[in-house]
Amino acid sequence: MPTVNQLIRKPRQANVKRNKVPALQENPQKRGVCTRVYTTTPRKPNSALRKVAKIRLTNGFEVIGYIPGEGHNLQEHSVVMIRGGRVKDLPGVRYHIIRGVLDTQGVKNRKQRRSKYGAKRPK
């Protein structure tokens, strides 16, 4: 425990909170255009081909967004909406593409957790 004199000489430092999604600039979502759609492999110990897209946002940022769900219709020049949320086993992927918004279609034949994948209610 520091003395009063030590605290006068060097005050306590406040914790600086680092922004985990800087490209959103405090907005809940941002729009962007896909510049490249590709698959990448996750870190150890996982193994898969994860679908991701490089996106140029309206504010000029270039980010990598994860495409959730099974199957997608994205290609170069598709207009997408992104939200924050990293993918733990993909380094550098700090954003998710929102399904069912703008050019991104919802997941087909989705019965549960439909709102997360932009799927309409089955008849």
Swiss-Prot record:
Gene3D superfamilies, A to Z: Nucleic acid-binding proteins
GO cellular component: small ribosomal subunit
Keyword Transferase: no
Alphabetized UniProt keyword annotations: Methylation, Ribonucleoprotein, Ribosomal protein, RNA-binding, rRNA-binding, tRNA-binding
GO MF assignments: rRNA binding; structural constituent of ribosome; tRNA binding
Residues with 3-methylthioaspartic acid modification: 89
InterPro entries, sorted: NA-bd_OB-fold, Ribosomal_uS12, Ribosomal_uS12_bac
Gene Ontology BP term (one): translation
Origin superkingdom: Bacteria
Function according to Swiss-Prot or TrEMBL: With S4 and S5 plays an important role in translational accuracy. Interacts with and stabilizes bases of the 16S rRNA that are involved in tRNA selection in the A site and with the mRNA backbone. Located at the interface of the 30S and 50S subunits, it traverses the body of the 30S subunit contacting proteins on the other side and probably holding the rRNA structure together. The combined cluster of proteins S8, S12 and S17 appears to hold together the shoulder and platform of the 30S subunit.
Record note on quaternary structure: Part of the 30S ribosomal subunit. Contacts proteins S8 and S17. May interact with IF1 in the 30S initiation complex.
The family this protein is said to belong to: Belongs to the universal ribosomal protein uS12 family.
Protein name as annotated: Small ribosomal subunit protein uS12
Organism: Rhizobium etli (strain ATCC 51251 / DSM 11541 / JCM 21823 / NBRC 15573 / CFN 42)
